[in-house]
UniProtKB/Swiss-Prot annotation:
Biological processes, Gene Ontology terms: tetrahydrofolate interconversion
Gene transcribed to yield this protein: fhs
CDD domains per the UniProt record, alphabetical: FTHFS
Enzyme class per UniProt: ligase
Source organism of this protein record: Elusimicrobium minutum (strain Pei191)
Similarity section: Belongs to the formate--tetrahydrofolate ligase family.
NCBIfam families: PRK13505.1
Pfam families (alphabetical): FTHFS
InterPro entries: Formate_THF_ligase, Formate_THF_ligase_CS, P-loop_NTPase
GO molecular function terms attached to this record: ATP binding; formate-tetrahydrofolate ligase activity
Residues the entry annotates as binding ATP: T65, A66, A67, G68, E69, G70, K71, S72
Substrates-to-products reaction catalysed: (6S)-5,6,7,8-tetrahydrofolate + formate + ATP = (6R)-10-formyltetrahydrofolate + ADP + phosphate
Taxonomic path: Bacteria, Pseudomonadati, Elusimicrobiota, Elusimicrobia, Elusimicrobiales
PROSITE patterns: FTHFS_1, FTHFS_2
Entry's EC annotation: 6.3.4.3
Name under which the protein is recorded: Formate--tetrahydrofolate ligase
Amino acid sequence: MLSDIEIAQRAKVWPIAKVAVKLGIKKSQIELYGHYKAKLSFDCIKKLQKKPDGNLILVTAISPTAAGEGKSTTTVGLAQALAKIGKKAIVALREPSLGPCMGIKGGAAGGGYSQVVPMEDINLHFTGDMHAITAANNLLSAIIDNHIHQGNELGIDERRIVWHRVVDINDRALRNIVVALGGKGNGFPREDSFDITVASEVMAILCLSESLADLKKRLSKVIVGYNFADKPVTAGMLKAEGAMAALLKDAIKPNLVQTLENVPAIIHGGPFANIAHGCNSVIATKTALKLADYIVTEAGFGADLGAEKFFNIKCRYAGLTPKVAIIVATVRALKMHGGVSKDKLTHLDKQAVIRGLVNLDKHIENVKKFGVPPVVAINIFSGDSKEEIAAVKAHCKKIGVPVELSDVFAKGGEGGIQLAKKVVDIISKNKSKFRFTYESEDSLEEKTKKIVKNIYGAKDVFFDKKALDSIKKYEAMGFGNIPVCMAKTQYSFSDNPKLYGRPEGFTIEVREARISAGAGFVVMLTGNIMTMPGLPKFPAAEKIDISSEGVIKGLS
């Protein structure tokens, strides 16, 4: 089989204006970025508001392996399958970050015959949104240091600045730095940090904003640090929100591309799900809902992370009601949860698959707790045996959960037709009983406990004194009624990435709490989660190259 990039480069891609016309969008309502990419204009978005909403389908997964279990591939493939059975469908995805593209994954635009294109552009710089977010974030950092250098009228305590610089690359050397060295003319020396761009609050704000006015309002609320009187200092107090919003004036507009089978795709925003809220933008999702009858979107990592935040944060703020949730499961991930070491995941082991089903069971239970009907999609890999696949299907049928095979990687939309039919049938027969894990009125501690106990299955949660002090401060500042955003390993229900399956009797430790006042949530950091990843021993970047003719290879 051809590689992902070879498949993408041989695709018959439509001019993006033709894709727009397919959606009923005039050429004058899109802003072209070459022949195959465009942004949807504010005029386009505004004129869609009176249209009825389509059906929102979420794609999530079991706790993944490091390689991922194919959520993006399944999302794209399902939309293509829906189109094949005559439904008007659209994909709504996050934008890939250069960090994992150059680190572990080598790309994040789907795979095989279920990709979004042009995949090289999407995986690399796309329409420049990531760079605009990086610039807006770092402008605020520059304004903070300049304010201190120019006399510090607001009395910012240099030791209590909480705003970090960002870059969209995995670079562990930047986790802890010292800035303004070299003499008095370079500013006030202090410790600082870099986060990856997709962990920036600016990214979260962009993805939760519904207009330019909303964006600017949220940016003004960003808390950058505290003054010597222990009062918060905001971006608004530094008069930074206008310039930041100006840098984001195009980045806030959703991007329109297409799948390999010319199904429309909106790709916009890209917060990580283990250290941020893990969903594409509200603007993109709401726009997609007006453009098609079936909208297929995804949330990062397993249902304990991305889906939980999709439901409790994004749907809460945006007023969204998902109709069904697809839980992507793979034989290899089930083997991992059944105790098989990473180097033996390709070996036949039906009993390990059966042991690992406890992980799938917990994710199914979690989706049901939100009142959303689940469907299990077994994402097929070439090395999977019939016996292993049959064991998963038999288990799902035994517990009464719909299950279908997904062969969209190898066959495109054709490989997901049965899954598409099942999804349409469930949507037509089920009325949504969507609900949240916690109420806005719950305290920040109570919200965290409800997630930890109900979604992760933990015995209890322990708050370090530092975290507890911060929580009490945030509640005193009036932020007690906003959601919590858990920062946790994606590999386990616990905060220990090596505790696979469905662990029991464990305690989650919240070591730090950080306020994201502009985004509107409090981040609870657990375990050893870092907001700046590092590159692996053999980064994917080593395999990426470009020919003298400008043809890229090595992306996947």
